[in-house]
Structure formats: structure tokens, C-alpha cells
Amino acid sequence: MIGPTGAVRVMVATKPVDFRKGAEGLAALVRETMRADPFDGAIYVFRAKRADRIKLVYWDGTGVCLFAKRLEDGEFRWPK
């Protein structure tokens, strides 16, 4: 199964990001803007300018996983 097992920290970026970025670009944002290590086992969550899309970046111990979700209707609620 893909994804974390057990308890894991979830870190949410509060500002929208350029959704053309892939796993490496988002990992760089984790380092630069969140001042965190993208390979620490936490899940990092980003949203597009339109709040109907999110991407999650996660290091599973063997590589970087990139998960994406687009809502058909509605928007994700996001912290300010």
C-alpha cells in the first residue's frame, strides 16, 4: 500500500503554490518557505490558487510520493 503507516505529522502550506510544480519543486518549497526537511516523513500539503486542487508530498523512505486531488464540485477549506 502507498502511504504512511501509523502516526504522521501533516504540515499545511497556507499560501497557494504554482501547480505546475512536481514532487521535486514542491520539496524545494518545503525547504525554502516552510524551513523543513521534505525527507523527514511528514506529509506536506499544498493547494492551487483555485481551492479545488491539492497536492501532497511525502517521503516514504525509498522515494518521494506525490499525491494529487481535484474536487469535481466545491473547494477545500484552508487555514489563513
Provide a role label for each language-model segment:
Residues 1-80:
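Polybasic/polar functional segments that serve as interface/processing modules
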